């Protein structure tokens, strides 16, 4: 399923013959619906994080850049590692072979204190040109 909230999943589970295996959701630093992630994980539903780099808008956040520098990685690498440490399947989008290679180089660990900071990072209010989706673009 995609973009199912807890109520949606509960309704589906009442009638479905086969439980969903994956819930693909928008998940990144500044949009971390932990209650939904924990619900899915508790119920054996994998969470797939699409747009872990926040449609590119996270690249404009100096606090995130500073944390990436602390770990000696790029902002996209920090973002991807963050979603992996949450126990999600991460789906970064790129057509650039260099970015693909870099996106796979996430063999570091974000410490617990920094994970909490990232979980509670201020919400990005606009995804710019990528904000065409009414719900996530703040248009509803």
Residue ranges and their predicted role:
Residues 1-140:
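Beta/alpha (TIM)-barrel catalytic core signal, keyed to glycine-rich beta->alpha loops juxtaposed to Asp/Glu
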């Amino acid at each position: 399923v995609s973009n199912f909230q807890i109520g949606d999943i509960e309704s589906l589970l009442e009638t479905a013959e086969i439980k969903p295996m994956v819930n693909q959701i928008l998940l990144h630093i500044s949009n971390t619906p932990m209650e939904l992630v924990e619900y899915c994980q508790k119920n054996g539903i994998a969470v797939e994080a699409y747009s872990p780099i926040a449609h590119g808008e996270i690249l404009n956040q100096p606090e995130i850049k500073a944390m990436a520098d602390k770990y000696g990685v790029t902002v996209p690498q920090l973002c991807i590692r963050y979603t992996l440490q949450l126990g999600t399947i991460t789906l970064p989008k790129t057509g650039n072979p260099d970015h693909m290679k870099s996106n796979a180089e996430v063999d570091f660990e974000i410490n617990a204190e920094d994970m909490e900071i990232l979980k509670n990072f201020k919400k990005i209010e606009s995804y710019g040109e990528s904000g065409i989706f009414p719900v996530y673009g703040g248009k509803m």
